[in-house]
Regions:
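Conserved helicase NTPase catalytic core signature
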Residues: 86-87, 91-97, 101-233, 243-247
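Charged, amphipathic alpha-helical linkers/stalks
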Residues: 52-108
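Short, flexible loop segments at the rims of nucleotide/cofactor-binding pockets, characterized by
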Residues: 79-85, 211-213, 235-239, 326-329
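Conserved helicase motor core of SF1/SF2 NTP-dependent helicases
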Residues: 11, 16, 25-53, 57-67, ...
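Walker A/P-loop NTP-binding motif
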Residues: 1-11
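Conserved SAM-binding loop
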Residues: 20
Length: 335
């Protein structure tokens, strides 16, 4: 797909304009062997963990994806599974969006601000400016509000404001908002949703992997999108291993065209995975294409796989090989 894009749009798009999101480097290493033939350098690659950590300014320690998978395999606690399932649901995304609106209406408490010895800015006027700039993300409003209020003071009182007074006003306005700590408002969300048990901090203040995307989503909603406009095409590998809330974060960061590849039956995390239909719902637009012809395996291997998990749409190619053997073992050591 990348080779096709570079060939078909030569001169319009180059390898540096494309980004791969992949859980491992095998995919990118394979691609890097193909691209030199097209006169291109390696395509930049990142992971979901890197993206989420960067959005959150690398503030938090967190369990990575493979740590989550390992825990599910070795000690799958029911409450851990329940937390993953809840945060991978569309209901969860909907509740987060409603909570962001709740913060808009309840987390800002305007108060009087004594700007100078003789001038006090009334709380009502401050509150009006918070609503005036409602198109801005909440945390982006504070500086704009302060500048506007000072401009009004200058017009009304012919006032020359010092830098110290300007900084004081910005600080006062920021402190009127009780959602300046991302982690605290994330905890508030679960209390507000009536599901406090759905958030659990691990030892050494480590976050679970499933908490990184919703925390990043809240951060982007309050701080504004850090849109990556230099990326012109995004390619996501192993699509089945990402949840709807992760795709919502991706959509905020990368508004470009995307190619999303994967196989829903190959998910290594059945509790937080996505099907093609779920991904289409998360993005609201896009075309789903199913590639049903299997070139990877012989007819015999594909037939065995069909006995384990049937897929009526799969079309094996008539390339024959040895019949796979099933070898029984009595214990793990023997195996």
């Amino acid at each position: 797909r990348i080779a096709y894009l570079l060939y078909a749009q030569k001169g319009k798009i180059s390898s540096k304009d494309i980004l791969i999101i992949s859980p491992n480097k095998v995919f990118a290493d394979y691609i890097s062997n193909v691209l030199p033939e097209l006169g291109e350098t390696t395509v930049p690659e990142t992971s979901m963990e890197q993206i989420l950590s960067t959005v959150l300014d690398n503030k938090y320690k967190f369990q990575n994806f493979f740590g989550q998978v390992s825990e599910l395999l070795e000690k799958p606690a029911p409450d851990f599974i329940e937390r993953i399932q809840y945060k991978a649901s569309f209901e969860f995304v909907s509740r987060l969006d409603k909570f962001i609106l709740h913060m808009e209406n309840h987390y800002f408490r305007a108060t009087d601000v004594k700007l100078t010895k003789y001038i006090t800015i009334p709380a009502e006027f401050v509150g009006e400016q918070f609503k005036r700039f409602h198109r801005y993300p909440i945390r982006q409003r504070f500086e704009t509000m302060a500048d506007y209020i000072l401009e009004m003071m200058k017009i009304q009182y012919n006032l020359t404001v010092t830098t110290a007074e300007k900084n004081l006003l910005r600080k006062e306005i920021k402190n009127m908002f009780s959602g300046n700590n991302d982690l605290q408002i994330y905890k508030d969300f679960f209390e507000w949703a009536g599901k406090p048990e759905m958030f659990k901090m691990r030892k050494n203040r480590m976050l679970e992997y499933a908490d990184m995307a919703p925390l990043a989503y809240l951060h982007l909603a309050l701080d504004g999108n850090k849109t990556q406009t230099h990326i012109r095409h995004l390619l996501i590998d192993e699509m089945q291993d990402y949840s709807p809330i992760q795709y919502k974060v991706i959509q905020k960061l990368y508004p470009c065209r995307k190619t999303i590849l994967g196989d829903a039956s190959q998910s290594v995390n059945p509790y937080g995975s996505s099907t093609a239909a779920m991904i289409q719902k998360a993005f609201t637009t896009g075309e789903v294409m199913k590639l049903c012809k299997s070139y990877r395996s012989t007819f015999e291997i594909t037939s065995l796989a069909q006995k384990i998990q049937a897929n009526n749409e799969l079309e094996p190619i008539m390339r024959h090989g040895e019949q796979p053997e099933i070898l029984p073992f009595k214990n793990a050591e023997e195996e």
